[in-house]
């Protein structure tokens, strides 16, 4: 019996150099037990480049930005051409732009993965010109099946788009199951790690209120953040707090990020909402205790392997981060719980269940 053929399009590999969604599709491409085609002309994606099996022209970030307009048009034309051919069993678009509905041959099924519902839950942070909700709704409504990456995402899909429950499969993300020791960064001896964006529903400002309170009592404590560069308002916030000299920003690659987790007192995740929360698993693999919000999908993913707090209550955050900064017994307990928990989340299992979803569509 011949293997299925699945077609991924260009969208996420055009948008992300690094990032959770492109990592998800990269891992599926590596692990799926089927033929995977990728329609992509030009990319700056790190994962494809590092694999040694990049099916597109790779450009460094700077020339890629200069040529962004023409590249977007070219990648779109490459995907449209491949989709029209129809020589695949399943089409799996890598993001929500419904451009493909005009060129997908009649009768060719597609599956869509929904990674979160933050545009629907927090429209105030995305502006009136935001197209994402309309795009997502159209793409989801016409899909043969939908993959949700958590129970919470499934519930939000039903709530906002009235999707029939039986049309949705829950398939968790995975993570590589080995820690890679690295020691290339010079880091402070004692720090809290914050990973990712800091705007709006990410709830960084509330966390910083708690951190500031603790750092004024513990003069050795630092904060390290990854993600986008500081905004002017953040720099002013740090200056006003009197803690600027103990706050660092690092734009970390995968190896450096591993070291940041490995040497941190704790990783903090104060977000009000996430579709899944890959950094939780990253912390577990790297033996880093986690203090996190008790909202959204976090209890679903972390279970007993986290120090929970109420994300909108600075005092609750303060108590959690204070405990993990000082209580070695609790830190060790959470490190061991995290190592046990993370074994449930492998890319092999993600790929296996995704293949089962494809089979449901083909057999319908």
Show where each model-derived region lies.
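Carbohydrate transferase catalytic cores enriched for Leloir-type hexosyltransferases
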Residues: 1-364
């Amino acid at each position: 019996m011949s293997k299925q053929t699945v077609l991924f399009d260009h969208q996420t590999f055009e948008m992300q150099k690094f990032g959770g969604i492109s990592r998800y599709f990269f891992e599926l491409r590596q692990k799926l037990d089927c033929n995977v085609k990728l329609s992509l002309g030009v990319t700056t994606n790190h994962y494809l480049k590092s694999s040694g099996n990049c099916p597109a022209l790779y450009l460094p970030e700077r020339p890629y930005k200069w040529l962004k307009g023409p590249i977007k048009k070219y990648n779109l034309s490459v995907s449209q051409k491949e989709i029209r051919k129809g020589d695949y069993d399943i089409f799996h678009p890598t993001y929500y732009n419904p451009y493909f509905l005009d060129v997908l041959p009649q009768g060719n099924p597609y599956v869509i993965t929904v990674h979160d519902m933050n545009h629907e839950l927090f429209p105030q942070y995305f502006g009136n010109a935001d197209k994402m909700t309309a795009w997502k709704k159209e793409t989801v409504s016409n899909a043969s099946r939908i993959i949700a990456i958590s129970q919470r995402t499934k519930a939000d899909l039903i709530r906002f788009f009235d999707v029939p429950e039986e049309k949705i499969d829950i398939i968790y993300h995975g993570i590589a199951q080995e820690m890679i020791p690295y020691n290339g960064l010079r880091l402070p001896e004692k720090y809290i790690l914050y990973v990712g964006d800091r705007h709006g529903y990410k709830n960084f400002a509330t966390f910083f209120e708690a951190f500031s309170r603790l750092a004024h009592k513990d003069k050795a404590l630092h904060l390290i953040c990854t993600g986008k560069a500081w905004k002017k308002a953040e720099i002013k916030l740090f200056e006003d707090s009197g803690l600027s000299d103990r706050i660092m920003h690092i734009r970390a690659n995968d190896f450096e990020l591993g070291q940041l987790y490995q040497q941190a007192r704790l990783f903090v995740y104060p977000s009000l909402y996430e579709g899944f929360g890959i950094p939780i698993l990253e912390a577990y693999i790297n033996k880093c205790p986690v203090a996190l919000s008790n909202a959204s999908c976090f209890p679903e993913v972390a279970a007993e392997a986290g120090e929970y707090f109420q994300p909108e209550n600075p005092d609750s955050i303060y108590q959690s981060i204070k405990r993990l900064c000082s209580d070695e017994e609790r830190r060790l307990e959470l490190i061991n719980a995290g190592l046990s928990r993370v074994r449930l989340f492998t890319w092999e299992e993600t790929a296996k269940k995704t293949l089962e979803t494809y089979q449901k569509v083909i057999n319908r």
